[in-house]
Amino acid sequence: MDLASAPRGESPPLKAPLVEIEAAEVERSLPQENAAPEEKGSNSQSEYESDSDALDDEWETQSLYEDAIQMIRDDQLRDGTIPGACTLEEAIEFRKRLHEVGKAQFVEETIARDTVTAKKLCTAFGILPPSFLEGAPDEAYHPLLAIAISREFARRQKLPQYNSVDDAVKLLKESKNIIVLTGAGISTSLGIPDFRSKDTGLYSKLENLGLNDPQEVFDIRIFREDPGIFYSIAKDILPTEKKFSPTHGFIRLLQDKGKLLTNYTQNIDNIEANAGVFPENIVQCHGSFATATCVKCQYKVAGDEIYDDIKKGLIPECAQCRKRIAEDSQKPQGQKRKRNSTSAHKDRSKSGEDSSDGEDYEIPTPGVMKPDITFFGEDLPDEFGRRLLHHDRDKVDLVIVIGTSLKVAPVAEVPGVLPPHIPQIYISRTPVAHTNFDIDLLGDCDVVVSELCRRAGWELKHEMISPDEKVDVTPVFGYGSRHVFKVSG
């Protein structure tokens, strides 16, 4: 396929209107509603704010499209199962050309010169043209294509020198400052459900409970209105025993070998502590069950103090509030707290109600204890951005992403924030389409890390790993850097 500029001589007229390639970046460039103005002389702070805001906005915009639009995998392009789509070879060439010449020149060479339709070009960047646009003029696909082009152009590019399992093992042995980014997939072998796996994930279970949006259970507004929704499923994600998976043990092994820079975990189960990973080596991006705080008085306790209530499906209440309520009940009547509002009193007086019957006094209730996990609508801990941008980014020499689909901002943008020359390995059951990793190791996380350790000559001791375990590793057809791990015996 010819992706070169028009032949020498008179160029054909450009089509109008052109794809607005910057459209996907407009929202990112707008100032945040509550953003503090940039102060001169505070370079580190302004850098953190601008980086974090841009990443957050970009991923939210992209996630909306990914939720609404069906994505195309490269294997579907390879197998030709999508009518009217690019072949995999064409798609790869389009992507390569985009990164070679930039967005503006790429649009001129393709859409502006009619070398390919916008509808077909969307498929090169992994987007299935939506059915509601079927029959529409090609210009109707331009906004969608603008998002696809901007997203692809911003993607980290794979390092061509890293492809094989041996390459992964060599990186593991030679690296000294490894960032490990983990998700729910590293805890599923312990019986803790993940969030997104079809039929088995936690979100699927919540859909069966009749929630409009499974994410509502982790929405801070919903929690404030009805904490019972969260506590109805909290027992399913609560770590009940001091166990840890082989993958947690692998992270501990990296620490013991002096190779672990930081474990950024999206998990809230705090199992890393069970494995012996030091607190100073962990950033709990979404908080954890390790502690809990009263939503009324901010009294903080160790998380295990509310475990019994959670296991029973009860809403844990603040012991400090209960103590204060009990003390208040012993005070003379005149010292009790009255209602703040006077309007209710006036309304009752007008209607002839007796306001001296004790209804003027509020009925005290203890506050609800909320585990210190980060709900949707709450800010991530400051430590996340501060450590990533001002400490780890300049030190890291290898990134290993394990057991996460990288769907939630801003953690999902960590691979793209780090220097592009740093090698990155992805370990999970299925590959991700929106991030380019250098090596994809597909399969059960525990199986993959145990085999990596075996090949590296490291001893990963764990009761869940059979000493006689044999693992078959097979390459994925059409992908030189993608490998599947399966236990064979």
UniProtKB/Swiss-Prot annotation:
Pfam family, one: SIR2
Keyword Zinc-finger appears in the UniProt entry: no
GO molecular function, a single term: histone H3K9 deacetylase activity, NAD-dependent
InterPro entries: DHS-like_NAD/FAD-binding_dom, NAD-dep_sirtuin_deacylases, Sirtuin, Sirtuin_cat_small_dom_sf, Ssirtuin_cat_dom
Keyword set includes Membrane: no
EC numbers, comma separated: 2.3.1.286
Originating organism: Emericella nidulans (strain FGSC A4 / ATCC 38163 / CBS 112.46 / NRRL 194 / M139) (Aspergillus nidulans)
Protein name: NAD-dependent protein deacetylase hst1
Domain Deacetylase sirtuin-type: 158-459
List of residues binding Zn(2+): C294, C297, C318, C321
Binding locations of NAD(+): 183-203, 266-269, 403-405, 428-430, 445
Family: Belongs to the sirtuin family. Class I subfamily.
Annotated segments matching region Disordered: 1-56, 327-370
